[in-house]
Each structure stands twice: as structure tokens, then as C-alpha cells.
A protein has these predicted regions:
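Conserved N-terminal entry element of GNAT/NAT acetyltransferase domains
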Residues: 1-19, 177-204
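Active-site/acyl-donor-binding loops of N-acyltransferases
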Residues: 2-5, 121-186, 253-281, 285-358
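A conserved beta-strand-loop-helix scaffold within acyl/acetyltransferase catalytic domains
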Residues: 13-92, 96-97, 199-274
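"Short basic amphipathic alpha-helical interaction patches in structured regions
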Residues: 88-92, 108-114
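Conserved glycine-rich acetyl-CoA-binding loop
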Residues: 98-109, 275-285
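Short, hydrophobic/aromatic alpha-helical segments in well-folded domains
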Residues: 110-113, 229, 287-290
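A generic, well-ordered mixed alpha/beta core segment in the N-terminal half of proteins
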Residues: 111-115, 121-124
Length: 358
């Protein structure tokens, strides 16, 4: 515990523990600009720590900034299992560095506490502000490999999205333009046919483990995707299985959530793990086809497919989806003892990194 004097208030930094969940969830829900409820935050804490297969009692959840007995700031982290070469290690995923305005001068003191822990781990920061980016890049963080600065998408209800970029005087043309976009997408898209079948069902743990073990040695640096990890990542998301006959050949995680800006639901492609024997074109075509059908049946306005790698980028472009700019702010810091074996070509990152898709 570290005590600091501010005027007549005693400010301290201490470790976060389970007894703090209630007060911290309320602090987060009431923090300026936050859109989650107290219950949402309690569920996040349980997911990050209590239900996390990589978490144990040795892991420090984070640190609180306390003034006169009340939480005025905090910073957190949670672990995930990560494959680094031949080793399975814990990765450090930083989250939620936030401090109330009157106490901002202690922000660096608070962040430094987390930094002291994270320097021994592979460490991710996936939701940094511009100021945070300037700071973490000085500490050795770099953008992790990605498939360029575009993402593919498919609009099922284009009207709200068009409305945002058109002047008011053009809004009478929205129905016509929306119809044109829908027809244009249908004419442009090229989905290859295959014998793959897709299911939104619970998958047998042994099948997931077999898929992971068959393919894990193709990539040096990536998230562990055994059954425990996948089921944790997929909590409150859609877990999609891809079969060729009776054999599980791919799994994908999809995230359905409301986009408050457009007041519409969107389905985002969060992760995909594919058997090396199956073409990525066949798998992505099947997934896109499934997502379009699912969206029509569940009032989803837009499908989003981030480009996890150059291979995903090239394949999604060949499929013919529309694309737009997507500057994914994912940063990683590799400890010195692992740097020699880390290359862009040997790595595979998705939206499972940090707290972005978790």
C-alpha cells in the first residue's frame, strides 16, 4: 500500500481484491462516458477473474486509487494462456485505466503499479488513447501483426449508416440508395460452395482439443485455443463450429452487440481457428453465408469481418465484401527472453487480445 497526501485528503494505492467488486462496479458504471451498468461490470469482473481458467490466486487483479476511503481510480489486468514458441505462458491483458479528474495527477503512479507486474509477461494493450500510445511505445510496446488497415463488412439495413454521412437534404433518397447497396452487395459477393456444415451448438471438449493440437505447431505466437480457453472466450458470445462430415475443421467466435451510435445490432467476427487441411476460402465463405442468414433471422443490421492477417484480408477481398478503414489499435510488448523467436510471419492475432473482444 502506498500513501500520498493531497490537500486534506489521504490518497493511497492498494491491491484490488474480491471485496472491492461491488464498490468498483458502481464506480465504473458512474464514471463519465461509461455506458455499462453496475451489473455489467460485476459480470465482467467474474469473467475476467473468477471464471477465467488462466486465473489463480497469485494473479494481481489490479490496483485501486483510494481517497478518504472511496475509490477515485483504478487499473486492472487479467491473464490468458498464450502459446510462445514451444511454451505455454500467461499473457498480461491490461484494462480500464481510469481516474477521476481531481486525482489525475496520480494516474501515472497508478499505472506504474501495473507496469511493474506486466514487464515479466507478454503484455497487451488493445484500447489505448492517443496519450497512452505515446507512453507505451516508449516502453517497448509495438503494434502487433494484423492484416492491414481495412475491415470487410456486409450491410443488411444500410439506411442508418448512409444517413450518418449524407446531408439532410439527401435523406429523401435513402430508400433508393439503401436498395442499391443491397443489390450491389448481392451482385459483388462470391461465396465458394463446399461440403462444410456449420452449427451454433456446444462442441465436444475432445473435438476442440483435437483441433487445437493438430494445428498449434503451425504458429509460434497465438492464443491457446483448447476447450477451456475457447469456452471462456465464447462466454456471452456465439460459438460456431464448422464440420467436414463428422470432423471438426474450424471454430469461430462471433460477438452480437448493439451499436449505440446507429441504434442497431451488429455481428462481429472475433476469432477463427482453422484446420490446416481445409482452405481458408471454403471456411470463410461458409461463415459469411451463415452470418448473412443468421443476421436476416435475428434483426442484425451489419456484419463485420476484421482482417486478422494478410491471408484473411486477401480472402475476404476475393469474396467481394465491402471494405472500410479499420485502424486496429492493438499493441504488444514481448519480454526480452522471447523477442528472438517473435516475427510477424510466425504470429496470429485476432480480437481475443487484451480486453477488446473479451
Amino acid at each position: 500500500m502506498e500513501d500520498i497526501q493531497q490537500n486534506n485528503s489521504m490518497v493511497e494505492i492498494r491491491e484490488l481484491n474480491t471485496d472491492d467488486y461491488e464498490e468498483l462496479s458502481l464506480f465504473n458504471a458512474q464514471f463519465p462516458g461509461d455506458k455499462r451498468t453496475k451489473e455489467d461490470w460485476l459480470n465482467r469482473f467474474q469473467h475476467w477473474w473468477d471464471n477465467n481458467p488462466a486465473f489463480d490466486d497469485k494473479w494481481i487483479r489490479g490496483f485501486l486509487l483510494i481517497a478518504d476511503g472511496k475509490i477515485v481510480g483504478w487499473v486492472g489486468s487479467f491473464p490468458t494462456w498464450f502459446k510462445a514458441g514451444e511454451n505455454i505462458v500467461k499473457a498480461f491483458n491490461g484494462t480500464s485505466w481510469r481516474v477521476l479528474e481531481p486525482f489525475r495527477k496520480y494516474s501515472i503512479d497508478l499505472w506504474t503499479k501495473n507496469r511493474e507486474i506486466s514487464k515479466h509477461f507478454i503484455s497487451f494493450n488493445t484500447t489505448p488513447t492517443e496519450d497512452v500510445i505515446k507512453m507505451i511505445t516508449r516502453l517497448g510496446y509495438v503494434k502487433y501483426p494484423w492484416g492491414g488497415n481495412r475491415e470487410s463488412y456486409y450491410l443488411l439495413k444500410p439506411y442508418k449508416y448512409i444517413q450518418e454521412i449524407l446531408p439532410q437534404t439527401w435523406h429523401r433518397l435513402l430508400p433508393l440508395m439503401g436498395t442499391f447497396i443491397i443489390l450491389y452487395q448481392k451482385a459483388k459477393i462470391r461465396l465458394v460452395k463446399s461440403n462444410l456444415t456449420l452449427k451454433l451448438l456446444d462442441i465436444n471438449a475432445d473435438e476442440i482439443n483435437e483441433l487445437w493440437n493438430r494445428n498449434k505447431n503451425r504458429i509460434e505466437f497465438t492464443n491457446v485455443r483448447d476447450s477451456l480457453a475457447i469456452q471462456w472466450y465464447a462466454e456471452n458470445k456465439l460459438l460456431l463450429s464448422v464440420f467436414l462430415g463428422e470432423k471438426l475443421t474450424a471454430i469461430a467466435i462471433l460477438d452480437l452487440r448493439k451499436n449505440l451510435k446507429y441504434d442497431s445490432f451488429e455481428l462481429t467476427f472475433v476469432d477463427c481457428w482453422v484446420d490446416y487441411e481445409i482452405s481458408i476460402m471454403s471456411v470463410l465463405s461458409a461463415i459469411v453465408r451463415f452470418c448473412i442468414k443468421y443476421a436476416k433471422e435475428n434483426d442484425v443490421s451489419r456484419l463485420r469481418f476484421p482482417h486478422f492477417s494478410p491471408e484473411y484480408s486477401n480472402t475476404l477481398k476475393k469474396i467481394g465484401l465491402l471494405t472500410k478503414k479499420y485502424d486496429h489499435p492493438g499493441y504488444i510488448r514481448i519480454p526480452d527472453y522471447l523477442k528472438k523467436s517473435f516475427t510477424n510471419e510466425s504470429s496470429y492475432f485476432t480480437l481475443l487480445q487484451g480486453d477488446y473482444g473479451v
